[in-house]
Amino acid sequence: MASMVTTGGILADIGTDHAYVPIALVQRQKIKGAIAMDINEGPLARAQEHIRAARLEEYIQTRLSDGAEALLPNEADSILIAGMGGELILHILTEGESVCSTAKELILQPQSEIHKVREYLRQHQYKIEDEDMVCEEGKYYPMMRAVKTEQDETWNRLNDQTIAVCDIYGPVSYTHLTLPTKLEV
């Protein structure tokens, strides 16, 4: 996930838990700073301890926040939402749309309902520019980097079945396939 974050910006980590990702990115000087946010005080306190231990209080702020509610528009270049179910990610994106849509990129790691997350991104004019999967302790976790774009005309050329397949299995490599278009159905 951390490798998907664009260099040089400010990261908002929604649901930060331990703040490991913001800490690692600041230490590597990949980002200027971060806003580590969590809905629960316990995880946020752990994040604050880790940030203090790394001596990065000057670079990483913490905020108690339900989703993106404590984030201002244009305050973050990258928004990371990871380690939670797809439905919760969709809730955060929907409730925080006025803020999330101002970020240059979304880095998402849904642990379920992946097809619904892809569908949301497509329907809200995001393009998935990078997608990968990691395996930790025998479990596979997809991750994706999406950027806001004008309407992607590629989707208009595909039939509904092909779009559904891309939502389930991922659209990043669909251009390498010979896919049926609306005219062929």
Where would I find each of the regions flagged by the language model?
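Conserved alpha-helix/loop element of class I SAM-dependent methyltransferases that forms part
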Residues: 1-7
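Conserved class I S-adenosyl-L-methionine
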Residues: 9-15
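Conserved SAM-binding loop of SAM-dependent methyltransferases across substrates and taxa
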Residues: 18-29
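Conserved SAM/SAH-binding beta-strand->alpha-helix loop
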Residues: 40
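Short alpha-helix immediately C-terminal to the canonical SAM-binding loop
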Residues: 44-45
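S-adenosyl-L-methionine
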Residues: 48-73
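C-terminal substrate-binding/active-site "lid" region of AdoMet-derived donor-dependent transferases
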Residues: 99-145
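Conserved small/polar residues in nucleotide/adenosyl-binding loops
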Residues: 175-181
